[in-house]
């Protein structure tokens, strides 16, 4: 019998990515974009179709499947909230996944937690804070090589840490969450207000390269908030470094040095600012983490 096949799935608000590994070798990597939003049933049918085609290509049963989820999944296996696709609320994820992969051991976890796990393994750093900036803000904390608070014990929701009392309303219903101030859409909204005209992602990239003041000010509003959140985590658990990734951050290299500068401003006497680096895996952190989760569940390390 050959080396078992493990599948990682990164479920996003706009697309779903898949990676099949055998040992350390990548067998297949593919993705699809969600169709028009109608119902969770339509989404699950689209997912099932892609899985069926993937199975045909690899031609080998799967030993284990790990799934990175952006929404909140309750202990009963049902989706409690997913702001990007609210029609998934109440979906029995556990049953749906076992129907798709009846022969495999299956587990799921927060996409930010899995991103942190993958980055920890890729960098060789056992104590790190990972922040993924995209449509929202996810993140994860790894201490001693283990995700914190722990798989199955809830997610590390740094995107919903409050950094500005009475600030902008977040999709979660509170005000002043990091996500409401520093996510990709939040940064673009601030940039549009400062410029006095709509700003796209590519327009912001170009303006930052050209040193346009409105672009720099828009980004600083986000990186100040990020530095405040990171400082709070540093005071509590003392990670060795911060890695910043996600699709939005991957294309704006100015984020990392800006956060680093504000962290230096916030440091207390006798305390060193945390090193800030770009995520080693870029926008693939959660997908690689999902594959790692499949390996853990296959080894019996995840119930």
From Swiss-Prot:
Alphabetized InterPro entries for the sequence: ATPase_NBD (IPR043129), ROK (IPR000600)
Gene transcribed to yield this protein: rifN
BP terms from Gene Ontology: antibiotic biosynthetic process
EC id: 2.7.1.179
Reactions this protein catalyses: kanosamine + ATP = D-kanosamine 6-phosphate + ADP + H(+)
The protein, known as: Kanosamine kinase
Recorded metabolic or biological pathway in which this protein acts: Antibiotic biosynthesis; rifamycin B biosynthesis
Keywords noted in UniProt: Antibiotic biosynthesis, ATP-binding, Kinase, Nucleotide-binding, Transferase
Family: Belongs to the ROK (NagC/XylR) family.
Keyword ATP-binding part of the UniProt annotation: yes
Function: Involved in the biosynthesis of 3-amino-5-hydroxybenzoate (AHBA), a compound that then serves as the starter unit for the assembly of a polyketide during the biosynthesis of rifamycin B and other ansamycin antibiotics. Catalyzes only the phosphorylation of kanosamine to yield kanosamine 6-phosphate.
């Amino acid at each position: 019998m050959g080396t078992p096949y493990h599948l990682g799935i990164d479920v996003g608000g706009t697309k779903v990515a898949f990676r099949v590994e055998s040992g350390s070798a990548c067998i297949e990597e593919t993705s699809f974009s969600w169709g028009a939003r109608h119902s969770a049933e339509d989404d699950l049918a689209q997912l099932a179709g892609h899985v069926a085609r993937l199975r045909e290509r690899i031609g080998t049963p799967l030993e284990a499947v790990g799934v990175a989820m952006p929404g909140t999944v309750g202990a009963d296996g049902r989706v409690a909230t997913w702001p990007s696709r609210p029609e998934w609320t109440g979906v029995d994820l556990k049953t749906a996944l076992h129907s798709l992969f009846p022969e495999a051991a299956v587990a799921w976890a927060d996409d930010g937690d899995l991103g942190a796990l993958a980055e920890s393994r890729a960098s060789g750093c056992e104590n790190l804070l990972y922040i993924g900036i995209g449509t929202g803000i996810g993140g994860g904390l790894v201490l001693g090589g283990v995700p914190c608070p722990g798989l199955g014990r809830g997610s590390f929701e740094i995107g919903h840490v409050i950094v500005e009392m009475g600030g902008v309303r977040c999709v979660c219903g509170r005000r002043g969450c990091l996500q409401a101030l520093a996510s990709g859409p939040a940064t673009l909204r601030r940039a549009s207000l400062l410029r006095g005209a709509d700003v796209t992602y590519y327009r912001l990239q170009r303006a930052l390269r050209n040193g346009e003041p409105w672009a720099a000010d828009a980004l600083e509003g986000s990186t100040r908030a990020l530095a405040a959140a990171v400082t709070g985590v540093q005071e509590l658990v003392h990670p060795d470094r911060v890695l910043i990734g996600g699709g939005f951050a991957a294309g704006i290299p100015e984020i990392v040095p800006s956060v680093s500068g504000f962290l230096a401003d916030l440091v207390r006497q006798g305390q060193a600012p945390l090193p800030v680096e770009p995520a080693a895996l870029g926008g693939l952190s959660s997908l690689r983490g999902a594959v790692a989760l499949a390996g853990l569940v296959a080894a019996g390390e995840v119930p």
